[in-house]
Amino acid sequence: MPKRKVTFQGVGDEEDEDEIIVPKKKLVDPVAGSGGPGSRFKGKHSLDSDEEEDDDDGGSSKYDILASEDVEGQEAATLPSEGGVRITPFNLQEEMEEGHFDADGNYFLNRDAQIRDSWLDNIDWVKIRERPPGQRQASDSEEEDSLGQTSMSAQALLEGLLELLLPRETVAGALRRLGARGGGKGRKGPGQPSSPQRLDRLSGLADQMVARGNLGVYQETRERLAMRLKGLGCQTLGPHNPTPPPSLDMFAEELAEEELETPTPTQRGEAESRGDGLVDVMWEYKWENTGDAELYGPFTSAQMQTWVSEGYFPDGVYCRKLDPPGGQFYNSKRIDFDLYT
């Protein structure tokens, strides 16, 4: 603390000087609590108030704080509420609980009251190093490969799904069937995996289909998946045909467009016998519901659904299945061709 030398007249020479210690203002740690003098509102002048008090290092962390009792005009707490309306007294009690004011009236929140993230506190930032340039982060597919889940081709995924689905059954229905108690009504056959294994395999195949962008795979039926497999040019569900189909000769004479679009009876039979019990339903239609109206077809269910979706039949047409012959005609607006694909 600074010391001041005071000389009393008639007591002695300058050598007989007494040292009188004058106390400074009390320094209060802002973290220790609220209270203490030094306010600009009720502060009393000391003997050395006109002198500089920066005798310390100049970087001290202690400073004068404002006590709540140093603020004039505060009200004491009365009733908490009246008539359902909350009454808040005019005082700094809540502010003092969460922080403090300095002598200049600036408000500071307590450090302990600040919200902390436990997850960030548990991170050891020393161990985290900057990733070297050129090193890319492993993707989700690579992480799955490291866990033993190898990526499969689209053909392998569809073939695996067809092995686990029943006719007219969706992927979601198969998951419910395999996940039920007992894994379905059918018993486990010789060499057939158990229901939990089939459930895990079906779930993994469906997840890979979703990862490839097919978000509606859980609502697709076995027949729809078989049509998609046929679209890939694969015929793995039926018996293997060693003789390849005849191809068109580029030097041959031009064929009529009707011959290319209209399937022959042989092609029709191959389409029906292709697959494990899968039958491609063929349709024929006419524009008017009269006996002498011209018939068009046959066409596949997928082709009919495409025309309906694109609005080629705004008023609807009268169509019927090709098999059995001589069936009744129905309006296309009442038929959902997706059920037959």
From Swiss-Prot:
Localization terms from the record: Cytoplasm; Nucleus
Molecular function GO labels: ribonucleoprotein complex binding
Gene Ontology biological process terms, A to Z: spliceosomal tri-snRNP complex assembly
Biased composition (Acidic residues): 49-58
Keyword terms of this UniProt record: Acetylation, Cytoplasm, Isopeptide bond, mRNA processing, mRNA splicing, Nucleus, Phosphoprotein, Ubl conjugation
Cross-link Glycyl lysine isopeptide (Lys-Gly) (interchain with G-Cter in SUMO2): residue positions: 26
Domain GYF: 280-338
Residues found modified as N6-acetyllysine: 44
Assembly information from the UniProt record: Component of the U5 snRNP complex composed of the U5 snRNA and at least PRPF6, PRPF8, SNRNP200, EFTUD2, SNRNP40, DDX23, TXNL4A and CD2BP2. Interacts directly with TXNL4A and PRPF6. Interacts (via GYF domain) with CD2 (via Pro-rich sequence in the cytoplasmic domain). Interacts with PQBP1.
Official protein name in the record: CD2 antigen cytoplasmic tail-binding protein 2
Species annotation: Homo sapiens
